[in-house]
Amino acid sequence: MVCLPCIFLPIMMAIYMKFIMPYVYRFLPERWVHFLDPILYPTCPMKIPEQEKKEEEEEKEKSCCSTEAENTTEVTTETKKDQ
């Protein structure tokens, strides 16, 4: 058998966070909200370095594709002249 606080506390917390907290945040000073947000909604402080890798890959693709694109345009212009 589950104790009653184990059932009611999560339900009450969900109701508070969903319906009551947005109204409370409207009346709090913004400085308090910025102080409380990291405590109430913690996030991982580790930064993911994927952005740098993606930018490097895009630069490599651009350099590869730019030479290929020039070659294809030359070929298409030659074929148009031949026709």
UniProtKB/Swiss-Prot annotation:
InterPro entries noted in UniProt: UPF0729_C18orf32-like
Biased composition (Low complexity): 67-76
Region (Disordered), start-end ranges: 51-83
Family of this protein: Belongs to the UPF0729 family.
Protein name listed in UniProt: UPF0729 protein CBG02799
UniProt organism field: Caenorhabditis briggsae
